[in-house]
Structure formats: C-alpha cells, structure tokens
C-alpha cells in the first residue's frame, strides 16, 4: 500500500485547495472490503483506495447533498432551472473511499471508465455495477465507485480499524470528491488509481438517488470541473431513474426514466427535446425498482447490515404489492438490457460520433395521467415485448414510495389465445419484435435469448387453477 501526492487545479475547492493524496490499494480487499464484489470470476480485480483532499461546503440544493433527504422538496429540486451555488466554507478537508473494478489484464481495457457515487441506503451500494457488471466485464470497462459522505459513518461503525481514517465535514463535499476522483483518474500518473491504463473517456452515471447525484453534478458543476489543460473531467453523463431536469452541456447526456419516474416525481415537467448532445428515454411498462440481471461469475458482497444515511425512505415491497391488482406478479421488465444498450450507444456516440436513437415520450392526457392502449399498457415511450407483444398489463404503484414498485397483471388465457392463437405464434411475434429492437439499437444482440426466456415464462395460454 502506497501513497502519492497530486497537484490539483482549484476544482470546486477554492483557490487554496490542499493537494489531494491517494492511498492504496488497501490490503485484502476481496476478503475484507465492505460492500465490495468478488470479481475474480470475470477476470477482474477489486481494489479499495482512500482519496484525501479538500472540497467546498455548499448550501444544499438536492437530496443528493442534503444531510437529511427528508429535509428537501424533491419536486422543486428536480425541476430547478437556475444553477448557481453558494459556498459556505471553502476547501474543507475530507477522506473518502474509492472502489475500483478493473480488468486483470491491461490489454482487455476498453479505454472507458464509468464512475458512480455509491448509494446511501445500506452503507453504499454500487447500483450501476450491480445491474451492468456483465456488460462492463465483457466490454473491458473500469468501474469506480465513490463513497458518499453520508455512508462513511456506517463503514467506520462496522470496521473502524480499516475505515477509521475516512472523514468529511458536510454532505455537500460530495461534489469535490467526485471532481477530484475524476481528475485523479484522468491524471493516469503516480497519483491515479488507474496508473498504467490508457483512458479515453470517463463517464459519470447513477440510478435513482445516484442518478440524482449525476444530474446534480452535471447541472451545477460540470462547467467548472476541468483539468489543468481545460479538458472536461467527465466526458458524458448517464443519469437514470431520477426524474431530474438536465441542462444543455458541451458533452453528451443520455437520460432514462421508468414509468415510475417520468411522472411520479415531477419528471413530466422536466422533459426537454432531444438535440445534438442529448437523449431522453422513457420506458413504457418499466418500474423504478427493477429486477436484477441473471447471476453470473461475479459474486455480490456478503449480506451485512450497514446504517443508511439520514432520511432515506423505508418501505416494504410486500406492503406495496398488497395494493396491486389481485393475481398480479412482480414487474419483470429487464431494464438492465436497455441500460447495456444505452452504454453501448453512448460509447459509439463518443468514439464514432454515431448518434444514438431517439424516441417519443410516454403519452399523457392534459392532466398528466398516463394514456393506456387497448391492452391496458402505457402508450408511447420505448417499447419492449412486455408491452408491444403483451400477455399482461404493466403498471406501477400510485401512492408515496409504492410508485417505485411495478406489477404485471397477467391476461386470462382466453385473452392471450384471442390475441396470438397459441404459444408458438406468440413467441414468433416476440422474436420479430426482438429483432426490431436489436436493429433499432434498443437492446444488444446478446439480450435476445434473455428476452425470449422471459416471454416463454409469461406465455400463459392455459387457464391457471
């Protein structure tokens, strides 16, 4: 374990910012690191580092930088159109943790680094790695998770010997942490956790709360987050399932909202049209709480109870489902397949200037209510076979946190028979729809069989007893 000092421009930390220091990799990360995946099965290496430096303390503007999430008016914050910041204290010290997942061989590295703020529920989950480690691993991408300040106390509570030196003053130091992490990554020198890797692009992403963090950084700090030579620290942003307005930037932005998000958190008012550097997708039938990808050779962290950050909502999926239609099933929409395609399309946008597809929004009435087609599913939006060749009505909850959860209400067998005839004819329709999605770049070819398997599982052509 070693350390190296880094010379920094005044990245969100004031003119008197201290030099940042990187320490690591820490010993025995796969065995001792909290919330760290075992990635040896996909020929990756998991490492932990500590990054120390200084960052400004700001007046909060978002759930992502509030000391208590419950203290914020999320509808107002997510719809903000004015992006100045008030600095309360300049250049305050911090030490945070970085989790790095990288290919064991530098020759496998794609040149892409994906960074995310770790989620504050349960001590810091890496949501985008959880969903897309299969894609990142097969592509050779590097993932870097940046510990959210409000999750540091939980790490120290569980393992003070390992994490006792982590420290921060205020949740709003997150923005300086993200900027300095990005600058360290792109530095590629002795002070970089990725020294020796030739980095072409660094992307910031997130889902739900971490999607809000991504959009908030893009809105308030992208324009000042520069390297000494004037280059952007982050080359693209992919905020997902966060409902937040994102201002026009000088780099590509690609947004994803589910049927829970586009209207449930004020997202309907935060739409803007696609342009030369912006795409906004809404996925009909998808719910905010999405099904995980199939298990593979990467092993998730051992279950451990870590304290959540203050104000995080607590709700029961089982309680929410009691309010769903009788006989309905959990939403099975494979959001991870479209997320993988989004990253693939973003890479082509960056590397080849090949523009990604555009889509229409989910359709609504004058009051903002979702318009339904004759099968009971949302009209418009990006449409996977779940709603384009349906055997169920897909919906989301309508009250408080239950809007995060979705359901599928299966059609009676007689309805499926009337629509498609039999299972073979239904699967043929699904197959044709999948080929359309691949051709239009909404899913990748390796998602073909997973979509077919989901269709086979929901092909109810016999009455259930």
Please provide the spans of the model-predicted regions:
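C-terminal His-loop and adjacent cap/lid subdomain of alpha/beta-hydrolase
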Residues: 2-465
């Amino acid at each position: 374990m070693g350390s190296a000092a880094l010379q920094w421009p005044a990245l969100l930390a004031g003119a008197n910012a201290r030099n940042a220091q990187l320490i690591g990799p820490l010993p025995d990360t796969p065995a001792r690191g909290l919330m760290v995946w075992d990635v040896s099965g996909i020929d990756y290496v998991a490492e932990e580092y500590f990054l120390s430096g200084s960052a400004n303390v700001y007046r909060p503007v978002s759930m992502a930088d509030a000391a208590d999430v419950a203290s914020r008016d999320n509808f107002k914050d997510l719809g903000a159109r004015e992006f100045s910041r008030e600095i309360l204290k300049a250049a305050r010290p911090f030490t945070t943790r970085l989790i790095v997942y990288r290919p064991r061989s530098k020759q496998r590295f794609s040149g892409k680094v994906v960074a995310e703020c770790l989620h504050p529920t349960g001590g810091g989950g890496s949501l985008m790695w959880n969903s897309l480690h299969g894609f990142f691993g097969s592509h050779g991408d590097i993932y870097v998770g940046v510990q959210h300040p409000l999750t540091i106390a939980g790490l120290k509570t569980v393992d003070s010997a390992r994490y006792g030196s982590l420290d921060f003053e205020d949740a709003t130091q997150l923005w300086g942490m993200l900027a300095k992490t990005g600058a360290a990554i792109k530095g590629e020198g002795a002070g970089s956790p990725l020294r020796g890797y030739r980095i072409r692009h660094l992307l910031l992403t997130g889902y739900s709360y971490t999607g809000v963090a991504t959009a908030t950084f893009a809105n308030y700090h992208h324009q000042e987050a520069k390297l000494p030579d004037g280059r952007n620290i982050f080359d693209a942003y992919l905020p997902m399932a966060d409902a937040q307005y994102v201002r026009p930037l000088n780099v590509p932005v690609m947004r994803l909202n589910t049927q829970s998000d586009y209207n449930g958190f004020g997202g309907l008012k935060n739409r803007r049209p696609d342009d030369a550097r912006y795409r906004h997708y809404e996925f009909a039938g998808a719910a905010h709480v999405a099904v995980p990808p199939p298990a593979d050779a990467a092993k998730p962290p051992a279950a451990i109870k870590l304290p959540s950050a203050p104000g995080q909502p607590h709700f029961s999926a089982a309680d929410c489902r009691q309010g769903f239609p009788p006989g309905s099933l959990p939403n099975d929409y494979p959001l991870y397949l479209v997320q993988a395609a989004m990253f693939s399309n973003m890479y082509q946008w960056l590397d080849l200037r090949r523009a990604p597809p555009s889509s229409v929004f989910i359709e609504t009435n004058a009051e903002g209510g979702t318009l339904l087609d004759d099968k009971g599913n949302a009209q418009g939006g990006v449409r996977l076979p779940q709603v384009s060749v349906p055997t169920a009505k897909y919906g989301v909850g309508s009250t408080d946190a239950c809007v995060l959860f979705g359901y599928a209400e299966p059609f009676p067998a007689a309805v499926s028979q009337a629509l498609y005839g039999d299972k073979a004819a239904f699967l043929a329709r699904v197959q044709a729809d999948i080929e359309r999605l691949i051709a239009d770049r909404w899913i990748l070819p390796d998602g073909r069989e997973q979509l077919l398997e989901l269709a086979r599982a929901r092909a109810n052509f016999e009455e259930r007893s």
